[in-house]
Curated annotation (Swiss-Prot):
Signal peptide: none annotated. A motif (Nuclear localization signal and RNA-binding (RRE)) lies at residues 84-93. One of its GO terms (molecular function) is RNA binding. Residues 126-136 have a biased composition (Basic and acidic residues). One of its GO terms (biological process) is mRNA transport. Keywords: Host cytoplasm, Host nucleus, mRNA transport, RNA-binding, Transport. Transmembrane segments: none annotated. This is Probable protein Rev. It is found in: Host nucleus, Host nucleolus; Host cytoplasm. The gene is rev. Residues 111-120 have a biased composition (Low complexity). Residues 108-137 are annotated as: Disordered. Coiled coil: none annotated. The lineage of its organism: Viruses, Riboviria, Pararnavirae, Artverviricota, Revtraviricetes. GO terms for cellular component: host cell cytoplasm; host cell nucleolus.
Amino acid sequence: MAEGFAANRQWIGLEEAEELLDFDIATQMSEEGPLNPGVNPFRVPGITEKEKQNYCNILQPKLQDLRNEIQEVKLEEGNAGKRKRQRRRRKKKAFKRMMTELEDRFRKLFGTTSTTGDSTVDSEDEPPKKEKRVDWDEYWNPEEIERMLMD
């Protein structure tokens, strides 16, 4: 089976496969945190060359995707953090949508807006205004917060 791929320039060998999986694990750790970094099967203690070759055969599609992803990043070095920024923006938009939906439900249930915050959601026809940063020292006294937590 490996002989058929040898003529194909897309075939990824053992050394490159090991490096690609190391890169993938490092990327996971930097983006998602070290909670579940993954395991590189090529670095498992006691693995034989035959097992490495079998892993290489099985993982070819994933390895080729990783190689292509790395090549895209090299071509767009200025946009290396583009996906992370896009993901962050999607999450922020989803959070805003969720909060607007919760505010609407609150209005339907109680007839007024929530009194927990000073901000109220206006009609969606108006463009959103630039939000100011909140200085929490104006709203909360640290001693008062400590008393509330101790009660």
